[in-house]
Amino acid sequence: MDIIDRKLLNLIQAPFPMVDQPFQKLGEEVGISEQEVIDRLTELKRTNVLRQISAIFDTRRLGFKTTLVAMAYEPEQLHKAAMEINKHPGVSHNYAREGSYYNLWFTLAVPPEHDLEATATYMSRKTGALEQRIMPTKRFFKIGVNFDMVNKKGSSFNFRPDSVKSGEDKAAADKDEAESWNKAVPVTEAEKDAIRGMQEDLELIPRPYDSIAQQLGMSTDELFALAKDFQERRIMRRYSAVLHHRRSGFRANAMIVWKVPE
Protein backbone atom coordinates (compact mmCIF):
# COMPACT_ATOMS: atom_id res chain seq x y z
CA MET A 1 0.00 0.00 0.00
CA ASP A 2 1.60 3.28 -1.11
CA ILE A 3 0.80 6.91 -0.33
CA ILE A 4 -1.70 7.15 -3.20
CA ASP A 5 -3.65 4.18 -1.80
CA ARG A 6 -3.64 5.83 1.62
CA LYS A 7 -4.86 9.15 0.26
CA LEU A 8 -7.64 7.37 -1.63
CA LEU A 9 -8.71 5.50 1.49
CA ASN A 10 -8.89 8.79 3.38
CA LEU A 11 -10.99 10.39 0.67
CA ILE A 12 -13.52 7.59 0.34
CA GLN A 13 -14.14 7.51 4.10
CA ALA A 14 -15.27 11.12 3.91
CA PRO A 15 -18.61 11.66 2.20
CA PHE A 16 -18.09 9.63 -0.97
CA PRO A 17 -18.74 11.67 -4.14
CA MET A 18 -22.33 11.28 -5.30
CA VAL A 19 -21.67 12.42 -8.85
CA ASP A 20 -22.00 10.67 -12.21
CA GLN A 21 -18.34 9.59 -12.29
CA PRO A 22 -17.12 9.46 -8.68
CA PHE A 23 -13.87 7.66 -9.43
CA GLN A 24 -12.91 10.30 -11.97
CA LYS A 25 -13.47 12.96 -9.30
CA LEU A 26 -11.36 11.02 -6.80
CA GLY A 27 -8.62 10.64 -9.40
CA GLU A 28 -8.56 14.39 -9.99
CA GLU A 29 -8.03 14.94 -6.26
CA VAL A 30 -5.01 12.63 -6.03
CA GLY A 31 -3.60 13.16 -9.53
CA ILE A 32 -4.31 9.80 -11.18
CA SER A 33 -6.70 8.53 -13.85
CA GLU A 34 -10.20 7.23 -13.25
CA GLN A 35 -9.15 3.72 -14.27
CA GLU A 36 -6.21 3.75 -11.88
CA VAL A 37 -8.54 4.69 -9.04
CA ILE A 38 -10.78 1.75 -9.93
CA ASP A 39 -7.80 -0.60 -10.21
CA ARG A 40 -6.37 0.49 -6.86
CA LEU A 41 -9.70 0.17 -5.04
CA THR A 42 -10.25 -3.24 -6.63
CA GLU A 43 -6.91 -4.40 -5.23
CA LEU A 44 -7.67 -2.90 -1.81
CA LYS A 45 -10.92 -4.83 -1.79
CA ARG A 46 -9.17 -8.02 -2.89
CA THR A 47 -6.73 -7.72 0.01
CA ASN A 48 -9.63 -7.09 2.40
CA VAL A 49 -8.56 -3.57 3.38
CA LEU A 50 -11.68 -2.04 1.81
CA ARG A 51 -14.86 -3.68 3.04
CA GLN A 52 -17.48 -1.85 0.99
CA ILE A 53 -18.74 1.49 -0.29
CA SER A 54 -22.40 2.18 0.35
CA ALA A 55 -24.98 4.31 2.10
CA ILE A 56 -25.04 3.99 5.88
CA PHE A 57 -28.47 4.48 7.43
CA ASP A 58 -29.57 5.22 10.98
CA THR A 59 -31.51 2.11 12.04
CA ARG A 60 -33.30 3.95 14.84
CA ARG A 61 -34.69 6.58 12.47
CA LEU A 62 -36.08 3.70 10.41
CA GLY A 63 -37.93 2.30 13.41
CA PHE A 64 -35.43 -0.40 14.36
CA LYS A 65 -34.71 -1.02 18.04
CA THR A 66 -31.07 -1.35 19.06
CA THR A 67 -29.13 -2.60 22.03
CA LEU A 68 -25.68 -3.53 23.20
CA VAL A 69 -25.59 -7.17 24.30
CA ALA A 70 -23.02 -8.82 26.54
CA MET A 71 -22.90 -12.60 26.92
CA ALA A 72 -20.73 -14.90 29.00
CA TYR A 73 -19.47 -18.24 27.64
CA GLU A 74 -17.08 -20.93 28.65
CA PRO A 75 -13.84 -20.21 26.73
CA GLU A 76 -14.13 -23.37 24.64
CA GLN A 77 -17.66 -22.38 23.51
CA LEU A 78 -16.90 -18.77 22.63
CA HIS A 79 -15.90 -19.11 18.97
CA LYS A 80 -18.78 -21.41 18.07
CA ALA A 81 -21.26 -19.10 19.79
CA ALA A 82 -19.87 -16.03 18.01
CA MET A 83 -20.20 -17.72 14.61
CA GLU A 84 -23.82 -18.62 15.35
CA ILE A 85 -24.66 -15.10 16.53
CA ASN A 86 -23.08 -13.64 13.39
CA LYS A 87 -25.79 -15.35 11.32
CA HIS A 88 -28.38 -12.89 12.61
CA PRO A 89 -28.75 -10.02 10.07
CA GLY A 90 -29.17 -7.44 12.84
CA VAL A 91 -25.86 -8.23 14.57
CA SER A 92 -22.80 -6.03 14.14
CA HIS A 93 -19.58 -5.21 16.00
CA ASN A 94 -19.35 -8.69 17.48
CA TYR A 95 -16.15 -8.93 19.56
CA ALA A 96 -14.63 -11.28 22.10
CA ARG A 97 -13.35 -9.03 24.89
CA GLU A 98 -11.19 -9.35 27.97
CA GLY A 99 -11.53 -7.59 31.32
CA SER A 100 -15.06 -8.70 32.17
CA TYR A 101 -17.02 -11.81 33.10
CA TYR A 102 -18.94 -11.20 29.89
CA ASN A 103 -16.58 -12.21 27.11
CA LEU A 104 -18.69 -11.61 23.97
CA TRP A 105 -20.10 -8.17 23.16
CA PHE A 106 -22.15 -7.17 20.11
CA THR A 107 -24.81 -4.74 18.93
CA LEU A 108 -28.22 -5.97 17.89
CA ALA A 109 -30.91 -4.23 15.84
CA VAL A 110 -34.38 -5.64 15.17
CA PRO A 111 -37.28 -4.30 13.09
CA PRO A 112 -40.23 -2.56 14.79
CA GLU A 113 -42.42 -5.67 14.83
CA HIS A 114 -39.80 -7.77 16.68
CA ASP A 115 -39.18 -7.86 20.42
CA LEU A 116 -35.60 -6.83 21.20
CA GLU A 117 -35.25 -8.59 24.54
CA ALA A 118 -36.93 -11.78 23.31
CA THR A 119 -34.57 -11.91 20.32
CA ALA A 120 -31.47 -11.53 22.51
CA THR A 121 -32.76 -14.10 25.00
CA TYR A 122 -33.41 -16.61 22.21
CA MET A 123 -29.87 -16.11 20.90
CA SER A 124 -28.48 -16.57 24.40
CA ARG A 125 -30.30 -19.85 24.91
CA LYS A 126 -29.53 -21.16 21.44
CA THR A 127 -25.79 -20.56 21.86
CA GLY A 128 -25.55 -21.82 25.44
CA ALA A 129 -24.61 -18.54 27.11
CA LEU A 130 -24.01 -18.72 30.85
CA GLU A 131 -25.51 -15.28 31.31
CA GLN A 132 -26.49 -12.23 29.29
CA ARG A 133 -26.90 -8.50 29.75
CA ILE A 134 -29.11 -6.42 27.47
CA MET A 135 -28.33 -2.70 27.41
CA PRO A 136 -30.73 -0.79 25.12
CA THR A 137 -29.62 2.59 23.80
CA LYS A 138 -30.98 5.37 26.04
CA ARG A 139 -29.20 8.38 24.60
CA PHE A 140 -27.05 9.00 21.56
CA PHE A 141 -23.82 10.98 21.92
CA LYS A 142 -21.41 10.10 19.11
CA ILE A 143 -21.03 7.54 16.38
CA GLY A 144 -18.60 6.67 13.62
CA VAL A 145 -14.87 6.53 13.10
CA ASN A 146 -12.49 7.55 10.33
CA PHE A 147 -9.10 5.91 9.95
CA ASP A 148 -6.50 8.43 8.85
CA MET A 149 -4.40 6.23 6.60
CA VAL A 150 -1.85 8.98 5.87
CA ASN A 151 -1.11 10.05 9.44
CA LYS A 152 -2.03 6.60 10.80
CA LYS A 153 -4.49 7.61 13.48
CA GLY A 154 -8.20 7.22 14.05
CA SER A 155 -10.75 9.95 14.69
CA SER A 156 -14.36 9.59 15.79
CA PHE A 157 -17.11 11.81 14.48
CA ASN A 158 -20.77 12.56 14.91
CA PHE A 159 -22.73 12.49 11.67
CA ARG A 160 -24.33 15.73 10.62
CA PRO A 161 -26.47 16.33 7.52
CA ASP A 162 -24.73 18.33 4.82
CA SER A 163 -27.40 21.03 5.04
CA VAL A 164 -26.63 21.83 8.68
CA LYS A 165 -24.32 24.81 9.13
CA SER A 166 -23.00 26.43 12.28
CA GLY A 167 -24.02 28.97 14.90
CA GLU A 168 -27.76 29.24 15.47
CA ASP A 169 -28.53 26.62 12.82
CA LYS A 170 -26.20 24.15 14.50
CA ALA A 171 -27.66 24.87 17.95
CA ALA A 172 -31.16 24.30 16.63
CA ALA A 173 -30.05 21.07 14.97
CA ASP A 174 -28.42 19.88 18.19
CA LYS A 175 -31.64 20.50 20.13
CA ASP A 176 -33.75 18.77 17.48
CA GLU A 177 -31.40 15.80 17.38
CA ALA A 178 -31.42 15.44 21.17
CA GLU A 179 -35.22 15.32 21.12
CA SER A 180 -35.80 13.18 18.03
CA TRP A 181 -32.76 10.91 17.47
CA ASN A 182 -34.71 7.83 18.59
CA LYS A 183 -37.96 8.65 16.79
CA ALA A 184 -38.83 6.73 13.64
CA VAL A 185 -39.32 8.71 10.45
CA PRO A 186 -42.13 7.62 8.11
CA VAL A 187 -40.84 6.17 4.84
CA THR A 188 -42.76 5.05 1.78
CA GLU A 189 -42.46 1.63 0.17
CA ALA A 190 -40.56 3.23 -2.72
CA GLU A 191 -38.14 4.80 -0.24
CA LYS A 192 -37.65 1.42 1.46
CA ASP A 193 -36.66 -0.04 -1.92
CA ALA A 194 -34.21 2.83 -2.39
CA ILE A 195 -32.73 2.28 1.07
CA ARG A 196 -32.16 -1.39 0.28
CA GLY A 197 -30.59 -0.52 -3.07
CA MET A 198 -28.29 2.14 -1.67
CA GLN A 199 -26.98 -0.24 0.99
CA GLU A 200 -25.58 -2.54 -1.69
CA ASP A 201 -21.83 -2.39 -2.25
CA LEU A 202 -21.04 0.17 -4.95
CA GLU A 203 -19.70 -1.34 -8.17
CA LEU A 204 -16.17 -0.31 -9.08
CA ILE A 205 -17.07 0.91 -12.58
CA PRO A 206 -16.95 4.42 -14.12
CA ARG A 207 -20.68 5.21 -13.62
CA PRO A 208 -21.73 3.04 -10.67
CA TYR A 209 -24.84 4.97 -9.67
CA ASP A 210 -26.56 4.46 -13.02
CA SER A 211 -27.35 0.80 -12.35
CA ILE A 212 -28.72 1.55 -8.86
CA ALA A 213 -30.99 4.24 -10.29
CA GLN A 214 -32.15 1.98 -13.13
CA GLN A 215 -33.06 -0.80 -10.70
CA LEU A 216 -35.14 1.70 -8.74
CA GLY A 217 -36.84 3.08 -11.86
CA MET A 218 -35.44 6.59 -11.55
CA SER A 219 -32.79 8.79 -13.09
CA THR A 220 -29.35 9.15 -11.54
CA ASP A 221 -30.10 12.78 -10.67
CA GLU A 222 -33.26 11.65 -8.89
CA LEU A 223 -31.18 9.14 -6.92
CA PHE A 224 -28.79 11.90 -5.84
CA ALA A 225 -31.71 14.13 -4.82
CA LEU A 226 -33.23 11.28 -2.81
CA ALA A 227 -29.92 10.66 -1.03
CA LYS A 228 -29.75 14.35 -0.11
CA ASP A 229 -33.31 14.19 1.19
CA PHE A 230 -32.46 11.12 3.29
CA GLN A 231 -29.55 13.01 4.84
CA GLU A 232 -31.63 16.08 5.60
CA ARG A 233 -34.21 13.86 7.32
CA ARG A 234 -31.30 12.16 9.15
CA ILE A 235 -32.33 8.77 7.79
CA MET A 236 -28.99 8.37 6.03
CA ARG A 237 -25.85 9.14 8.00
CA ARG A 238 -23.52 9.25 5.05
CA TYR A 239 -22.42 7.56 1.84
CA SER A 240 -18.88 6.33 2.33
CA ALA A 241 -16.40 3.50 2.47
CA VAL A 242 -16.00 1.14 5.41
CA LEU A 243 -12.55 -0.32 6.06
CA HIS A 244 -11.44 -3.45 7.87
CA HIS A 245 -9.55 -1.67 10.62
CA ARG A 246 -7.12 -4.50 11.39
CA ARG A 247 -6.25 -5.01 7.72
CA SER A 248 -5.77 -1.23 7.52
CA GLY A 249 -3.10 -1.34 10.23
CA PHE A 250 -5.19 -0.32 13.26
CA ARG A 251 -4.59 -3.21 15.64
CA ALA A 252 -6.04 -1.97 18.92
CA ASN A 253 -9.75 -2.04 19.69
CA ALA A 254 -11.08 -1.41 23.18
CA MET A 255 -14.45 -0.67 24.72
CA ILE A 256 -14.52 1.61 27.75
CA VAL A 257 -17.34 1.50 30.29
CA TRP A 258 -17.74 4.31 32.83
CA LYS A 259 -20.19 4.71 35.65
CA VAL A 260 -20.92 8.43 35.92
CA PRO A 261 -23.57 10.55 37.67
CA GLU A 262 -26.71 11.13 35.61
Report the location of each language-model feature.
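A compositional/biophysical signature of low hydrophobicity enriched in polar/charged and small residues
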Residues: M1-E262
